[in-house]
């Protein structure tokens, strides 16, 4: 839309409605990503500006795990084919996705926060340039201790996860958040990132 200033020949380009911000949380297993996100979600519960969408996963919910929408592999494939997902990926033998409704939230200028795989970062940036990547991590010794305490993997699997943890995403808008102390400290740092202007 172009607006001519009264009494002058000047033409002012009206600024488009600002787009929202996509905040993608990544990091190694044992870093505490879900705990940090949940802490921020609770702190921002009264703020409609911030959206924390539930992920869609091809597994049943179990006590202690994140709340998510469950789909069978067949239903997941059908939804993917009709473009129902904003992002989707496969990890550890499961399919994951973020709902397509995220696009509407971003179009209305809201901040969307989600835990994703590093594999979809570039696709997310292409879809929505105003993307911030928050790498939640901890020192290797802390990660190893947390992974062993979970008891889900054997020693070889733990070593493999620690090796992958060394690789961090690059590109614009990447923030590293160290979660090696009290959870509330990491949550407060994360809230500061969410409330800060996006760096694109």
Language model feature labels by segment:
Residues 42-52:
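Post-Walker A helix-loop "phosphate-sensing" segment adjacent to the P-loop in P-loop NTPases
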Residues 26-28:
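P-loop (Walker A) phosphate-binding loop of NTP-binding proteins
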Residues 53-112, 116-118:
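ATP-dependent small-molecule kinase phosphotransfer cores
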Residues 31:
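ATP-binding Walker
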Residues 111-117, 127-150:
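Conserved phosphate-donor/acceptor-positioning beta-strand/loop module used by diverse small-molecule
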Residues 149-200:
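Small-molecule kinase domains that catalyze NTP-dependent phosphoryl transfer to phosphate-bearing small molecules
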Residues 1-22:
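Extreme N-terminal, non-catalytic leader segments
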Residues 34:
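Walker A/P-loop
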């Amino acid at each position: 839309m172009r607006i001519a200033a009264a009494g002058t020949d000047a033409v002012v380009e009206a600024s488009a409605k600002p787009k929202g911000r996509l905040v993608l949380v990544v990091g190694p297993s044992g870093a505490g990503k879900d705990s940090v996100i949940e802490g921020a979600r609770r702190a921002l519960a009264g703020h409609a500006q911030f959206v924390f969408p539930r992920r869609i996963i091809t597994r049943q919910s179990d006590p202690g795990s994140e709340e998510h929408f469950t789909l069978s592999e067949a239903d997941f494939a059908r939804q993917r084919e009709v473009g129902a997902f904003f992002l989707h990926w496969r990890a550890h033998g499961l399919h994951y996705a973020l709902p397509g409704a995220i696009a509407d939230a971003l179009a209305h200028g809201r901040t969307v926060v989600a835990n994703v795989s590093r594999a979809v970062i570039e696709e997310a940036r292409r879809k929505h340039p105003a993307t911030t990547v928050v790498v939640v991590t901890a020192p290797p010794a802390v990660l190893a201790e947390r992974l062993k305490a979970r008891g889900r993997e054997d020693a070889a699997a733990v070593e493999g996860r620690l090796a992958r943890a060394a690789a961090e995403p690059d590109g614009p808008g990447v923030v590293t958040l160290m979660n090696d102390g009290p959870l509330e400290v990491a949550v407060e740092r994360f809230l500061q990132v969410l409330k800060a202007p996006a760096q694109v």
